[in-house]
């Protein structure tokens, strides 16, 4: 519940303690309760991802990139299997993005990024046309530690989100 409460299965729901890693932030809570402007959220996500991929390329260890590569391979395998569900692909997509947050080695960026990604959870559809290709481009750029290509892929990905959103408004 975004750091406000902790749910402990079998024990109940409790107000989060100060030791909680994702402390409640009134500004983030304001985003939750206001009407969501998808275009504004997309702009925020774009800014965060552009900076995030730079941090990942600069900070991730080779071992972390191997784990990221394994996660991408799982995602690609699910997308290649026509019988796979969009739900499973979306789950792996989210895991990949959360892993990017972890391996940027900046807990503030990670927490904000994961928060923003969670706001997009219901709209994520990795089966949209072009999404798999742009994910592969972004991943390849990260694996090659190529900041310019990674930033280009983030821009391309953002355009796909905007187009998909516009298509739902028609």
Summary of predicted features, one role per range:
Residues 1-47, 54, 58, 170:
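Short linear motifs at protein or domain termini
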Residues 29-33, 81, 142:
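Short amphipathic alpha-helical segments at helix-loop
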Residues 41-141, 149-164, 168:
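Conserved amphipathic alpha-helical segments that form helical-bundle/coiled-coil interaction surfaces
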